[in-house]
Amino acid sequence: MICDRFRWVFCQLEVLRHCFPSNLRRILEELPKSLDDTYKRILREINNANHVYAYRLLQCLVVAHRPLRVEELAEMLAFDLSPGGVPKLNADWRWENQEEAVLSACSSLVSVIIERGSRIVQFSHFSVKEFLISDRLARCMEESQFYIIVEHSHTILAQACLGVLLSVDNCTDQPSSRKLPLYEYATEYWVQHIQIGNVELVIKDTLDRFFDTDQLHFSSWLRREYPYDFSTDSEDEDTDMLPSTATLYFAALLGFHGLVERLVVKQPQQVHLLGGHCGTPLHASVYGGHIEVAQLLLAHGADINSRSALDLTPLHITSEMGYLKIVKWLLNNGANVNSQDVRGHVPLHFSVSAGHLDVCRMLLKHGAGVNTRGNTGSTPFLEAWKSGHTDMICLLLEHNPDVTSGKT
């Protein structure tokens, strides 16, 4: 409350600082009586012609996963994000003076600071963001056009990110920040924006286009972000194109339920094939922690005990990741609790090594072998002993481990 009062005083002083002496008395009489009223006044003074641009910039500032540089935020003004269409970046719409464009559109609601050599756009005060997403603004008759719905804002930024990535089709060269200012942000955060609420459903057409295997957009991003998943040694394949199994695999890994559903209907055989580093699409979905996607894949015939190139099953992966809910679901649907990988390790080895006590308890409840030896003779109990995890050791001692097993 005290902080809000200081902010209110600051805003009033800013108004008075720019007024002529002859207007001082009138301005004093018209000053807003609260911080909310101050922000309403600022919103009303935003030029009607600039409303759509100001609103878009404010939306991005509300939901951005990191502070945006001036050139990144200004790039949002160059996008055609018409409903129902694929986002298009128009270079002719870019402003020459990007900082002026941002500040003139958003007025005193935002400011620019210098941080580590970059010019960063931020809200002038934390209360600005709070007000823009508040029910108080939503109930206003005139100013409610600036009320920001968070999920819709994620949709806007997701569309822009995909618009940037759709403009890139070179698999080796990363675009310069001068050519595509938003590329760095888009590459890192597009997935997080799509995973919010119903954003994936809203931008379905754009997402389908990005994942189109006949295009190079998705493969261009993928080969930069997941280079270990693909070999370019084959002389029989076009190295710019992805393996046919990669699309479903990565849709599952990223948790795109709607896209996975469309893909398995279109190519049901892909459910069973290795698509990347983790293994099958089912491996990928549980690695990403996406139980709904895993359930969808199982409903379309995925093998719950399918194996990766290293003989890992989905249960091995979830046991190491510590996803108790998914571990329980896999076990209840027939996952082999004592399946061994190429090293002879069972899921219990993985959960013990990772220190996931609750997962270990669940595996033991379903018959996990506490004395199962790996190829080197190591048992889950010896793994716990090496780690010094006291609670884990006590849990395993309840199941009569062979404390002498293993190679010495």
Model-derived features with residue positions:
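Ankyrin-repeat boundary/"N-cap" motif
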Residues: D240-L248, L273-P281, R307-T313, Q340-V346, ...
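Ankyrin repeat A-helix N-terminal signature
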Residues: F250-G255, A284-H290, I317-Y323, F350-H356, ...
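Ankyrin repeat domain, specifically the short helix-to-loop turn at the C-terminus of the second helix
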Residues: R262-Q270, Q295-D303, K328-A335, R361-A368, ...
